[in-house]
C-alpha cells in the first residue's frame, strides 16, 4: 500500500507482542479472530486520518474531539488485517485464511432476520472479517 505523506495508519503492536509471546505455547489447534476492519489498501483508501475514533453518549468523535473528555470516551479503530496476515504467515506459513464474516457464516446461515443481518455484505457481513490461523 502506498500511503500518502501525512497519512495516519494504525499499527497493532500489542497483537504482535501477544501472538509471538503465546506462539511457543500453542502446539496444535485453530485460532479465530473476528473483528471490524479490512486489509490495508481498502481500509485506508479514503481515510487519510486513519480509522481512530471515539464514542461518547452514542456520538462518534474524531480529530481533536477524541481528547476533550478523557476517561469518558471509548476509543477504537479498525483492525488492519494486513498486519495480522503478514505476522501470521511469517509464523505459521500457509495455514492462515482471511475472509469476510459473510463468507464465514453463509454455509451455516438460515433464512432468519438475524442471519440476514450478520451476513449482509453492506453491513456487518462485509465490515467484519475473520482471520483463521491453524497450527497442525
Spans of features found by a protein language model:
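Long, Lys/Arg- and hydrophobic-enriched amphipathic alpha-helices
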Residues: 1-136
Amino acid at each position: 500500500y502506498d500511503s500518502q505523506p501525512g497519512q495516519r495508519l494504525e499499527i497493532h503492536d500489542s497483537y504482535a507482542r501477544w501472538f509471538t509471546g503465546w506462539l511457543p505455547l500453542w502446539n496444535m489447534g485453530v485460532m479465530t479472530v473476528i473483528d471490524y476492519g479490512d486489509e490495508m489498501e481498502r481500509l485506508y483508501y479514503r481515510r487519510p486520518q486513519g480509522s481512530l475514533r471515539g464514542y461518547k453518549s452514542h456520538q462518534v468523535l474524531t480529530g481533536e474531539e477524541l481528547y476533550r473528555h478523557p476517561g469518558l470516551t471509548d476509543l477504537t479503530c479498525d483492525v488492519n488485517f494486513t498486519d495480522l496476515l503478514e505476522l501470521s504467515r511469517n509464523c505459521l506459513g500457509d495455514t492462515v485464511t482471511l475472509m469476510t464474516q459473510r463468507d464465514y457464516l453463509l454455509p451455516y446461515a438460515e433464512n432468519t432476520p438475524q442471519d440476514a443481518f450478520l451476513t449482509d455484505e453492506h453491513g456487518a457481513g462485509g465490515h467484519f472479517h475473520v482471520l483463521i490461523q491453524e497450527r497442525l
